């Protein structure tokens, strides 16, 4: 990404934001560490200088393979939020994360994790669950705790653009397998004497604490809540995974260029307007049909597009697993008292909380 593009991002995206709504800049898509740490140090400084206002927040999602002293210094200096892509034990991780020479990357990733731990830099792990992962809840839990990793989020393997199909779509018992995995992982969290932070548990905890009339925020269906900038300055919004996908009807989801302006340049795009209208129809359909709408907010446009081939559809496998089954499974665990007397802080609860959440979503219906 050129300095010209960085300056345009600062001028057209960052500077217009009110001081109390400074954006989080997420460096993602591909592997951000293919560029040297020195490049990011200059880029961060340029964005600060050109964008004005309070300090920006930055986040990296990385495979951690290249972590060294330079990266440690960068992330510590700029207080960067670090996410590491790590799929559990070596055999699971290496089955889909390989080096350019075709070798497994697990050992290299763990070397990076060790360096982060030695430096005292906090990080979280994102683990992609494949069909092969679903029977391995204990192995995955034991691996993470054995490595001193206690902050994990699960993504399910998705159908995304030209990346190929998800192994979960080819598994007829995927719902049962995912439910079984999550139940066992929740059990392990509950009986562990040390706290284990799992996004899926804490997400439901947040729903239980929310006001009864408050629908879950879904930034992916609201235009411009997320703005994605490609390496050449192409602008997109909605789901970040959309940019670059082949979609002639939507100009491959490139709705403008940051060098030509910010949000307004996207508003002027016919392709953006078509996508926005179609996504809105999909959200309305979800609201009309789905008893989980209050806790989902209309699904992820990228998953609808890649699974269904359209934005105005409703349920996807991604939604069924990560929203519906996750909610039901965690609420079942709460109702069963799985987290009573647990080390998981904040899950000592009035039993009416989970029952009330079922009433709000209709998820008590079977």
How should each PLM-predicted stretch be described?
Residues 201-320:
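Accessory C-terminal segments flanking Radical SAM cores
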Residues 95, 99-107, 114-235, 242-258:
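Radical SAM enzyme [4Fe-4S]-AdoMet core and its adjacent flexible, acidic
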Residues 18, 121, 149, 194, ...:
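Generic structural signal for secondary-structure transition and capping sites
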Residues 8-28, 313-360:
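Short Fe-S-cluster ligation motifs
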Residues 362-365:
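Acidic, carboxylate-rich catalytic segments that either coordinate divalent cations
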Residues 6-26, 35-159, 166-171:
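Radical SAM/AdoMet-radical enzyme domain recognition
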Residues 1-4:
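Canonical Radical SAM [4Fe-4S] cluster-binding loop centered on the CxxxCxxC motif
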């Amino acid at each position: 990404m050129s300095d010209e593009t960085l300056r345009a991002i600062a001028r057209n995206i960052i500077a217009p934001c009110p001081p109390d709504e400074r954006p989080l800049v997420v460096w993602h898509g591909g592997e951000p560490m293919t560029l040297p740490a020195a490049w990011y140090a200059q880029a961060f400084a340029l964005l600060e200088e050109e964008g004005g206002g309070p300090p920006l927040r930055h986040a990296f999602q990385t495979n951690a393979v290249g972590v060294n002293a330079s990266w440690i210094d960068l992330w510590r200096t700029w207080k960067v939020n670090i996410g590491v892509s790590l799929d559990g034990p070596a055999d699971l991780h290496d089955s889909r994360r390989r080096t350019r020479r075709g070798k497994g990357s697990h050992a290299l990733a763990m070397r990076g994790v060790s360096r982060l731990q030695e430096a005292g830099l906090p990080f979280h792990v994102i683990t992609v669950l494949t069909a092969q992962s679903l029977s391995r809840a204990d192995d995955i839990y034991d691996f993470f705790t054995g490595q001193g990793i206690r902050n994990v989020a699960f993504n399910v393997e998705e159908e995304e653009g030209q990346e190929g199909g998800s192994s979960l779509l080819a598994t007829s018992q995927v719902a049962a397998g995912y439910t079984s995995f999550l139940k066992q992982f929740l059990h392990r969290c509950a009986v562990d004497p040390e706290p284990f932070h799992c996004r899926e548990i804490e997400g439901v905890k947040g729903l239980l604490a929310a006001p009864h009339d408050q629908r879950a925020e879904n930034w992916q269906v609201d235009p411009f809540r997320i703005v994605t900038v490609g390496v050449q300055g192409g602008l997109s919004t909605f789901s970040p995974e959309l940019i670059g996908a082949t979609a002639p009807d939507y100009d491959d989801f490139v709705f403008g260029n940051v060098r030509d302006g910010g949000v307004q340049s996207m508003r002027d795009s016919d392709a953006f307007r078509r996508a926005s209208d179609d996504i809105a129809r999909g959200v309305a359909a979800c609201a009309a049909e789905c008893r989980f709408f209050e806790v989902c907010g209309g699904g992820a446009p990228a998953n609808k597009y890649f699974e269904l081939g359209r934005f105005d559809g409703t349920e996807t496998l991604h939604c069924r697993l990560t929203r519906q089954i996750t909610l039901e499974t965690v609420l079942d665990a709460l109702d069963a008292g799985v987290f009573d007397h647990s080390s998981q802080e904040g899950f000592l609860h009035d039993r009416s909380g989970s029952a009330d959440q079922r009433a709000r979503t209709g998820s008590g219906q079977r």
